[in-house]
Amino acid sequence: MKKRILAAVLAAVMVFSLAGCAGNKNESKDSKKESGKKTEIQVFIAASLNTVMTELAKEYQKDHPDVKITYNADSSGTLLTQIEEGYECDLFFSAAQKQMDQLEEDGLVVDGTRKNVVNNQVIVVTRKDSKTKVKGLETLKDAKSIALAGGSVPVGKYTRAALISIGKLKKVEDPATITTEEVSKALGGVEISEQDNVSKVLSAVVEGSCEVGTTYYSDTYGYEKDLDILEKVSYDLTGDVIYPIAEVKNDEADKAQKAAAEDFLKFVTSDQSKKVFDSYYFDTNVK
């Protein structure tokens, strides 16, 4: 039996008040129907999608009040591991192709449902009025402290790839394998605080516990008064930052649940949703 994601266990899980809390998996489908409960879908999203997906869920549920959307938001690597370990999931929205590729290799993606949705951009940020000497990636060594996601986190991998591109790190087959300690050494021993996901990187900079950090452009939405963007890192250095979405095979889902997951995926990839993504600083011009 697949494990359920409970808000009390995973702090990153977002359950909308209009959707209620995740129920006990031991509850039978018949009892759910009898009690009038909504059709629930489990949607695993990269942490950087938290804000925009909150907006999209609210929009979707205006026309689909019978569907309950439960989000689990974390780094794409963590979400992949959870799915592989048996956590119940209907849709996976990753911040990188690597994790989705692995899920397909595992045979856990529903054939024909994978779609590229948005592109993002890695940026170097600092808190307003920090008076940092850092101007961008080239001068990261001048920082007093850096918030950096681990290599298994997409933004951490993209940052490492960019540092390789500008000659700050040695070229390796997979940038994700470069440790935080190796990055620190390459940057002259600068203090680096490794973070589990991009949201924690952002928080570390906004709260002032780290002088600078690398995050996504979309993460600055709502923080314009708190942050200064020191550099928008060129795609030539990182490659495209594509976010794919797909249905995940869920043997315990009934027909209504599978239909709801399919319909929500269509909504997320619709022209209506593109306008919302654009407003949250994502690039929807992807193939």
Enumerate the predicted regions with their spans.
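Exported/periplasmic ABC-transporter solute-binding proteins
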Residues: 22-58, 62, 77, 97, ...
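Ligand-binding clamshell of periplasmic/extracellular solute-binding protein-like
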Residues: 71-81, 88-104
